[in-house]
């Protein structure tokens, strides 16, 4: 770590982090995630040192993989911020390949000479014969200043980790890890993933100006792995004392000659006391800033998931550190599809039909907390609808003069409104249509429900509160800023947007007038891990925003 005082008072650190959270949230209203990376068959990488920025103001000396000078990668998906692949980043570049293709990864060791050899380990991938490099304990290595080339045929689809296979207790801790995503071959994509409901969901996105940022229509070669949106999260922790000692020893051995006495590092990696807990190389709130944000030149990837009701959201998760992290997704369970590219199928000989495509049924568990095991990757589907709320999430009101408040809900065979993909209540749970939640609402929503909301003057709104119990800016504006005929405490006629109990101020991360989504915290269930250097909030924490269709999820950030 750079020469900074690690012994700041808790009070000073708390004030600093609180200020950082506030400033970051002001700029994260439209910062989303997707699963950005570089795609191709040839990747020229380097391992090099740099500093990682942390929310408490620290810059931590680290090592990471990056793109070699002169290598021009193909960035996917196309984002409004130009993709950046510096010579060092944490996590390393997400390598995106297609099943069955021949892949070549060349690694040049630009670490300090005293750091010794380095390498890349691709667990579960069969490598071809080596023509360069130095044999190591687990894989072929690159000596300081030298190069090693890894060749393999891209295996079955799915998400996998890659990381250093050399002195892993130090090199992985220092940041030498990344993700390998294998996409299904185009001919292997199940037909139902490009037709039927999959097509309707794309129509729903297009009707509101959204673009398809998926890497593929399916996660695996299986008809029950279709998805509508995707995110990649790599979990790791960092003990700054190890990094500080590594930097000090590198400085002390600067200019040494490979193989000479004393030209090596002897950094203790135990006892282990991490202070930073990272999602995609960043701690909260930094993880909610955009991908490729210039303030994080060596931490390009964010963690800021969004979705619409009814979408199948693929989450790709990798445990990259030394510890196991219980990743808790509020809002619903995650259906595990596979681990390390191995689809979990039923042992039964029976088959099911998925929109006319027969296949062996999946057997992955449903988990409300998905454990991220060191070195292990999994793919899972997160799904959310308003079913089970027991009130109309869109605040429909049959007596309203607003046409969006009187939309119809025609149930399909599963009870959802899927007939018109252009409607803002596409995928509404029709059983709760027009069902009120508030007993005596002020605004233009149905009344005579079971709930009296607390007085807005008696509590403070959280940064992610959408402004009302309803989904979307139309419903929230009606609920908080309108008086209409038939409401128990208002005059006759319709007066919308003139007065109201709110929309509330202060909800800067989920503005009531433009987004008004339902926010679900996604975080480590080891509560210490949602801190930054022991200060809450921070660490492994992000928010999943479920947004109404009227809100455009613009993942070009």
Model segments located where?
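Copper-binding active sites and cupredoxin-like electron-transfer domains
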Residues: 2-10, 17, 24-25, 29-557
């Amino acid at each position: 770590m750079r020469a900074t005082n690690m012994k700041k008072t808790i009070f000073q650190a708390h004030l600093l982090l609180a200020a950082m959270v506030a400033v970051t949230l002001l700029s994260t209203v439209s910062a989303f995630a997707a699963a950005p990376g570089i795609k191709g068959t040839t990747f020229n990488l380097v391992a090099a040192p740099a500093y990682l920025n942390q929310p408490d103001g620290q810059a931590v000396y680290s090592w990471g993989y990056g793109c070699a000078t002169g290598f021009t990668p193909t960035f996917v998906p196309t984002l409004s911020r130009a993709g950046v692949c510096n010579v060092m980043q944490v996590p390393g570049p997400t390598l995106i390949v297609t099943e069955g293709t021949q892949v070549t990864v060349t690694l040049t060791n630009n670490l300090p000479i005293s750091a010794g050899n380095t390498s890349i380990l691709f667990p579960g991938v069969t490598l071809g014969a080596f023509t360069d490099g130095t044999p190591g304990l687990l894989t072929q290595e690159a000596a300081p200043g030298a190069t090693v080339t890894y060749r393999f045929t891209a295996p079955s689809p799915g998400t996998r980790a890659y990381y250093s296979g050399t002195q892993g207790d130090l090199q992985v801790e220092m940041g030498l890890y990344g993700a390998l995503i294998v996409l299904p071959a185009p001919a292997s994509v199940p037909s139902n993933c490009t037709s039927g409901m999959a097509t309707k969901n794309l129509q729903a996105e297009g009707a509101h100006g959204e673009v398809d940022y998926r890497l593929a229509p399916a996660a695996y070669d299986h008809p029950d792995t279709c998805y509508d949106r995707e995110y990649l999260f790599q979990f790791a922790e960092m003990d700054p004392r190890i990094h500080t000692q590594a930097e000090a020893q590198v400085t002390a051995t600067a200019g040494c000659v490979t193989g000479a006495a004393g030209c090596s590092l002897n950094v203790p990696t135990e006892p282990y006391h991490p202070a930073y807990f990272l999602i995609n190389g960043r701690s909260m709130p930094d993880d909610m800033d955009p991908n490729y944000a210039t303030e994080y030149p060596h931490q390009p990837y964010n963690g800021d998931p969004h979705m619409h009701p009814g979408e199948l959201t693929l989450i790709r998760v990798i445990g990259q550190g030394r510890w196991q992290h219980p990743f808790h997704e509020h809002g619903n369970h995650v259906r595990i599809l596979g681990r390390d590219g191995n689809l979990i199928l039923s042992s039964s000989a029976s088959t099911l039909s998925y929109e006319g495509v027969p296949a062996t049924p999946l057997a992955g568990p449903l988990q409300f907390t998905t454990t991220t095991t060191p070195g292990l990757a999994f793919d899972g589907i997160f799904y959310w609808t308003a079913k089970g709320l027991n009130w109309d999430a869109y605040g429909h009101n049959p007596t309203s003069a607003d046409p969006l408040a009187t939309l119809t809900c025609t149930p399909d065979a599963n009870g959802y409104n899927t007939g018109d993909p252009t409607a803002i209540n596409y995928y509404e749970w029709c059983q709760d249509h027009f069902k009120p939640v508030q007993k005596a609402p002020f605004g233009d929503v149905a009344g005579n429900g079971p709930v009296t909301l607390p007085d807005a003057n008696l509590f403070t709104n959280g940064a992610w509160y959408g402004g009302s119990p309803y989904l979307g800016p139309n419903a929230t504006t009606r609920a908080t800023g309108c008086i209409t005929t038939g409401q128990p405490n208002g005059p006759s006629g319709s007066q919308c947007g003139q007065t109201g109990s709110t929309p509330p101020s202060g909800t800067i991360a989920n503005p009531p007038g433009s987004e008004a989504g339902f926010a679900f915290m996604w975080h480590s269930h080891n509560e210490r891990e949602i801190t930054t250097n022991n200060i809450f909030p921070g660490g492994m924490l992000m928010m999943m925003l479920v947004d109404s269709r009227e809100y455009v999820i613009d993942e070009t950030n």
